[in-house]
């Protein structure tokens, strides 16, 4: 489950200066003038494995796209024209890898701030020879606002975002009305927004916020069944076995 908390390498053999510079935008890039938002992640030190460190060092240039405050040329980034799916907060990338492999006709752009998660997915991409997946390591709000052209996405996945369970922290939840409106504007007509959470009160908020966006319509009467393309994670399977709930929401651009 993604916590949207960027990890920092522990003390030891440092990443190269070039790699550090490539990673820095995920933590230090300023907002565009006059455009500010409450970030849905916090800066804390975290563990990163040697394999993840090696992937960051060796594979960022091959499979990642640097943040830039201008629309991304998807055809150039992927080397082909294909429907593009944006995934926000892919955690360690297990689900992202499986979906990209199962849907070779689509392009997938994953956005994450964790060094450990980015390193993990880079390794998965290389190991599984996934050609239809790219990564942007940067704040998701800025990526959507600055790099995604209006009416351009075939779909958006937001799976298990940080629930920020304390009431005073709910303002940090990713899926707030302004961001949902921004996501909806980036979807092509007929494009979908698929969210999943295992926190019931966040599911209630998601349903309210998505249902209040004029550009979106619910494809179900309330919550949706888990679509076949979203694999059930080990964490999710264990939670369901213990009686915990998982709520999927599927909305489409009108």
Curated annotation (Swiss-Prot):
Binding-site positions, substrate: 166, 198, 233-236
GO MF entries: tRNA (guanine(46)-N7)-methyltransferase activity
Keyword Transferase among record annotations: yes
EC number: 2.1.1.33
SUPFAM superfamilies: S-adenosyl-L-methionine-dependent methyltransferases
Sequence positions that bind S-adenosyl-L-methionine: 87, 112, 139, 162
Catalytic site positions: 162
Alphabetical list of Pfam families matching this protein: Methyltransf_4
UniProt key word Iron: no
Catalytic function, reaction form: guanosine(46) in tRNA + S-adenosyl-L-methionine = N(7)-methylguanosine(46) in tRNA + S-adenosyl-L-homocysteine
Uppermost EC category: transferase
Domain of life the protein comes from: Bacteria
Gene Ontology CC terms, in alphabetical order: tRNA methyltransferase complex
InterPro entries assigned to the protein according to its UniProt record, in alphabetical order: SAM-dependent_MTases_sf, tRNA_(Gua-N-7)_MeTrfase_Trmb, tRNA_methyltr_TrmB_bact
Chain positions covered by the region annotation Disordered: 1-34
Pathway(s) it belongs to: tRNA modification; N(7)-methylguanine-tRNA biosynthesis
Keywords: Methyltransferase, S-adenosyl-L-methionine, Transferase, tRNA processing
Purpose: Catalyzes the formation of N(7)-methylguanine at position 46 (m7G46) in tRNA.
NCBIfam families: tRNA (guanosine(46)-N7)-methyltransferase TrmB
Family: Belongs to the class I-like SAM-binding methyltransferase superfamily. TrmB family.
Protein name from the UniProt record: tRNA (guanine-N(7)-)-methyltransferase
Organism: Bordetella pertussis (strain Tohama I / ATCC BAA-589 / NCTC 13251)
Phylogenetic classification of the source organism: Bacteria, Pseudomonadati, Pseudomonadota, Betaproteobacteria, Burkholderiales
Gene: trmB
């Amino acid at each position: 489950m993604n916590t949207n908390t960027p990890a920092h390498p522990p003390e030891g053999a440092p990443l190269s200066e070039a790699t550090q510079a490539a990673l820095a935008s995920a933590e230090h890039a300023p907002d565009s003038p006059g455009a500010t938002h409450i970030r849905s992640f916090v800066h804390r030190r975290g563990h990163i494995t040697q394999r993840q460190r090696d992937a960051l060092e060796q594979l960022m240039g091959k499979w990642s796209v640097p943040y830039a405050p201008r629309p991304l040329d998807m055809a150039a980034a992927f080397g082909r024209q294909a429907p593009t799916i944006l995934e926000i907060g892919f955690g360690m990338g297990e689900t992202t890898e499986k979906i990209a492999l199962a849907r070779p006709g689509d392009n997938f752009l994953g956005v994450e701030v964790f060094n450990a998660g980015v390193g993990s997915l880079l390794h998965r991409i290389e190991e599984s020879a996934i050609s239809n997946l790219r990564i942007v390591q940067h704040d998701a709000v800025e990526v959507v606002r600055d790099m995604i052209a209006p009416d351009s996405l075939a779909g958006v996945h937001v799976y298990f975002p940080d629930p920020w369970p304390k009431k005073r922290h709910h303002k940090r939840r990713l899926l707030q009305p302004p961001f949902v409106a921004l996501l909806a504007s980036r979807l092509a007509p007929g494009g979908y927004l698929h969210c999943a959470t295992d926190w019931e009160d966040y599911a209630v908020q998601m349903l309210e916020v998505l249902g209040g966006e004029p550009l979106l319509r619910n494809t179900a009467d309330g919550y949706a069944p888990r679509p076949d393309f979203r694999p059930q994670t080990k964490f999710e399977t264990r939670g369901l076995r213990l009686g915990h709930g998982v709520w999927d929401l599927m909305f489409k651009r009108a």
